[in-house]
């Protein structure tokens, strides 16, 4: 477990955030987990390895390949994630991704 994710109260908040969002599909779950990590663990994006831990915490089934799922969500067709410049393999949720995956209000 990455040290940023060690707080039990933050882990509980993250889990509630993910459950309340109730995303359907792997790409939406990746966006919700990425945004949840940003909000509740104050991290600057996530990588495929961290997503595995975050999916476990949220109680979600893992996709076959996190790296490919990240890339798909970041493709121009969707634009739900963006690569963080200078941070190899790290992605952050875009405002479009957040609007498409999180309930409003």
Pin down the residues of each PLM region.
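Short alpha-helical segments that sit at the start of domains
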Residues: 4-45, 104-105
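Amphipathic alpha-helical interface surfaces
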Residues: 26, 47-50, 62, 66
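Short, charged/polar micro-motifs that form catalytic or ligand-binding hotspots
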Residues: 40-41, 56-60, 87
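Short acidic, hydrophobic short linear motifs in intrinsically disordered regions
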Residues: 42-55
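Short amphipathic alpha-helical interaction segments
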Residues: 60-76
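Accessory beta->alpha helical hairpin/"wing" motif in late/C-terminal subdomains of nucleic-acid enzymes
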Residues: 83-104
